Regions:
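Long, position-biased, composition-driven segments near the start of the mature protein
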Residues: 1-373
Length: 373
């Protein structure tokens, strides 16, 4: 916090004047009842019927017709084949289900196997998914960034890429994307376990009977980035949430403690006294106390080495030669190729990052001989 109307959640941040912000303040919860209530409960309406969840995580209304259709699709004609089990679900089970939903096409079955002490077979499924990687086309033109590929001619495989900070920022920005936004970008076809089915289930459930509102439905289907998570080199269009403004309070006592809380319609009414402000949050990617978005995650200018499996390290002549030695690739087998990365390539990189261990090779399609020439 400083006297120029800005605050930061991080230590040693500099304000506009260049000085380190060193006044501590305690963050308080908002007092607006509406904003507090919005975070309570779930996405589904209270009193709604039970739901039917299939093994591949399709969520459907718990109607008899849906149940019979599911059994028919599974070729189960005799009800005597069915067995009922009750399962307790705690934090450990939720984590297992989350992991299974990302990697397995039958996560509920896999979860039961794990509960019974079976071995984890999901790695094989992940490899099979990578083999069926499909390309995703962009919907509009976008800016481009250059990337130099170093290719093994004999293996027709990308060994590594040489990039500037723009491409490194692009890759790191993938880590900030909400899962729902990733599925939206990929058109609900991520090939990632069963999450595509979950995404489709939310689309199919109506706000008349099941989901609480269109706003909450949109929150699941099109979640926004957290404030300041977007970067200047982000080729993919994911909307960023706006950063709230804050009010500053003093307890009016000799020790003079300071408090801040998000600015809402009721924030000026507080037992702490009259609020001062507004204050704006500093963009953590800014070195000069800016409160606007943008910026990048890595320092520039710099060069980075990106492996086929998307391991990003600082580039140096020694590191690249050492890496070729580890791969046992002779220098005479290495060719160079400069490619352009736009929205379409960024979409395919995002998809490959989720399901492939050879992302660069898969995206830039080295079976196309024009890339190797």
């Amino acid at each position: 916090m400083d006297g120029r109307g800005i605050l930061s959640e991080f230590a040693n941040v500099r304000c506009h004047c260049g000085q380190v912000m060193n006044q501590l303040a305690t963050m308080l919860e908002p007092v607006d009842a509406a904003s507090c209530d919005q975070g309570e409960g779930g996405f589904l309406k209270g009193g709604a019927d039970r739901f039917l969840v299939s093994d591949d995580l399709r969520v459907m209304p718990g109607l008899s017709s849906q149940c019979l259709m599911l059994l028919k699709n599974l070729s189960i004609m005799d009800a005597k084949e069915l067995e009922s089990q009750s399962m307790n679900i705690g934090p450990e089970e939720i984590l297992q289900l989350l992991r299974s939903s990302l990697l397995s096409k039958t996560p509920l079955t896999h979860w039961i196997w794990l509960k019974q002490g079976a071995s984890d077979l999901m790695e094989l499924e992940l490899n099979n998914m990578a083999e069926s990687l499909d390309k995703t086309s962009a919907t509009s033109d976008s800016k481009k960034m250059s990337l130099k590929l170093f290719i093994s001619k004999s293996r027709e495989q990308v060994l590594y890429a040489e990039s500037g900070e723009d491409f490194a920022d692009l890759l790191f920005s993938f880590l900030t994307f909400p899962l729902g936004s990733i599925l939206k970008l990929l058109g609900g076809k991520s090939l990632l376990g069963c999450v595509d089915n979950l995404y489709g289930s939310v689309k199919d459930l109506s706000t008349d009977n099941y989901l609480k509102s269109d706003e909450l439905k949109n929150m699941l289907l099109c979640p926004k980035l957290a404030p300041f998570f977007a970067c200047e080199n982000q080729l993919l269009h994911v909307e960023e949430s706006s950063s709230p403004q804050y009010l500053l309070y003093s307890n009016g006592k000799p020790n003079n403690k300071w408090f801040v809380r998000p600015l809402t319609t009721e924030s000026n009414v507080s037992s702490l006294g009259e609020g001062l402000g507004p204050l704006s949050m500093v963009n953590p990617k800014s070195s000069t106390g800016e409160t606007t978005g943008g910026g990048g995650y890595v320092k520039g200018p710099a060069k980075f080495m990106v492996t086929d499996a998307l391991v990003v390290t600082q580039l140096s002549p020694i590191s690249s030669i050492s890496f070729l030695g580890k791969l046992d690739v002779p220098i005479t087998d290495v060719d160079e190729k400069v490619v352009q990365v736009g929205e379409e390539e960024a979409l395919n990189l995002l998809k490959a990052a989720l399901i492939s261990e050879t992302a660069l090779t898969d995206v830039f399609n080295l079976t196309d001989k024009s890339v190797l020439e």
